[in-house]
Amino acid sequence: MKRRHLLQGAAALAGASGFAAPSLAQPARTTTLRFVPQANLTALDPIWTSAIVTQMHGYHVYDTLYAVDGQQRARPQMAAGHEVSADGRVWRIRLREGLFFHDGEPVRAADCAASLARWSRRDAFGQILAAQVDEWRAVDDRTLEIRLKRPFPLLLDALAKPDSNVPFIMPERLART
C-alpha cells in the first residue's frame, strides 16, 4: 500500500467521523405565535380606527369577502363567487362552505350584511358605495344580496379594499355595536 493511499483513507475516515456524532439538544416544538407590533395595540376595533397596528390585528382576527391579488384585481376570499343582475343593480355574493369565526360560530350572510353596513358608515370608499346601496340583506345563511340604486362598477374594488378601513367581516353581534 502506498503512503498516499493510506493518508487519503485516514483523512476520509477522520472527516466522516463527525457524521456519526450525536445531535445537539433541540428545543421542544412550540405552538405559541409571538406578535410584536410596531406600536401598542390600544384599540381592537379595525373599523373605528385607521391605526396600522389595529388593522394588522384585524387581519389576524377577521377576513374579507374579496381581496386583491398580485395584479391588484379583486378575487374571492370568503366569497365563493357572485352573480350580478342584467341591469347591474343586484349583486348576490355566495359564501364559501365551512367558514367559521374564532369562537366556532359559522359565518352567515347576516354577519356580512351587518359588517358591510357598519364599515360603509366609517370608510370614505364605503360611504361612496353606501350612497348607492338600497339594501344589504341576507337571502339565506350563505347568500348576501346587495341592492343598488344604480350600477356601481367599483363594488368589488370596495369590498377588496386592503388598507385604511378594511371591510372586515365580523360576527353580527359585534357589527351591530
Where is each model-derived feature located?
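N-terminal export signals
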Residues: 5-25
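Short, glycine-/polar-rich solvent-exposed loops and beta-turns at beta-strand/coil boundaries
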Residues: 28, 75, 128-130
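Short, well-ordered beta-strand elements
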Residues: 30-39, 90-92, 145
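N-terminal lobe/hinge region of extracytoplasmic solute-binding protein
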Residues: 36-86, 117
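Pocket-flanking alpha-helical
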Residues: 42-46, 68, 100, 123-128
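Hydrophobic (often cysteine-bearing) scaffold residues that line and stabilize catalytic clefts
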Residues: 54-58, 108, 140
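Aromatic- and charge-enriched surface segment that lines or borders ligand/interaction sites
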Residues: 80-125, 139, 145-147, 155
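Surface-exposed binding/hinge segments that line
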Residues: 128-177
